[in-house]
Amino acid sequence: MAYKEELAALGEISFEKIRRVAYNYVISLPEEDRNALFDSLNHGVNLLDSDAQMKLYMYSFGKMHQAKVYRALQSLDLNVFTQNDFDVVDWGCGQGLATVCFFDYLKTRHITNRAGNIILIEPSDSARERAEIHVKAYVEPHTNVRCVGKYIDDVTEEEIKSESPVTIHFFSNILDINSIDLKRLAEKLGASVQGQQYIICIGPMNSGNR
């Protein structure tokens, strides 16, 4: 069964159900294969380019990722998302987990998902395609989901331009990568700002990031 069909069989989508698909796959693997696959993730740092890697990442790191996104969102005044349409820009999105968890979080607060445009930035073709599948399962058919197959430094101002009154940006486990030019990134964000902009930065849980 194709992955898209696996998700469709879940009924109403949620992060927990997405992870359940990954869980069922991973526990069916022989331990030796599972360990070799885990080593290929390099603690979640390597680009994901296979269905098996993406499912193991979801199985291994998904719940921790969800907890960090929820914790970050607790600092936001969610009223802004009840009163306005909004855009989402997910930088280095991987499988789109930050956006998925954000949509789930809105649902737990009984807030209608009013996303108009979603921009998924990710250099891995496989992960980006998986992110698009995940995100489209949450939104109405008229919602514009745009994929940008680039590294962060290569993204242009035009590609992240938003015309909605509210835009939320997610940087999840990405800004600690030394190769990213943070000054250049800040300049791009500043040049594209329109309306209210919320920037959610989530990093590894280690003492150096406190």
Language-model segment annotations:
Residues 45-79:
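Class I SAM-dependent methyltransferase Rossmann-like catalytic core
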Residues 165-181:
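A short SAM/SAH-binding and catalytic strip from SAM-dependent methyltransferases
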Residues 129-162:
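S-adenosyl-L-methionine
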Residues 195-206:
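Conserved beta-strand signature within the Rossmann-like core of class I S-adenosyl-L-methionine
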Residues 183-195:
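A short glycine-rich, Lys/Arg-flanked "PGG" loop and its adjoining helix->strand segment in the class I
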Residues 1-40:
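N-terminal auxiliary segments of SAM/dcSAM-dependent transferases
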Residues 95-111:
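Conserved SAM-binding loop of SAM-dependent methyltransferases across substrates and taxa
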Residues 124:
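Conserved SAM/SAH-binding beta-strand->alpha-helix loop
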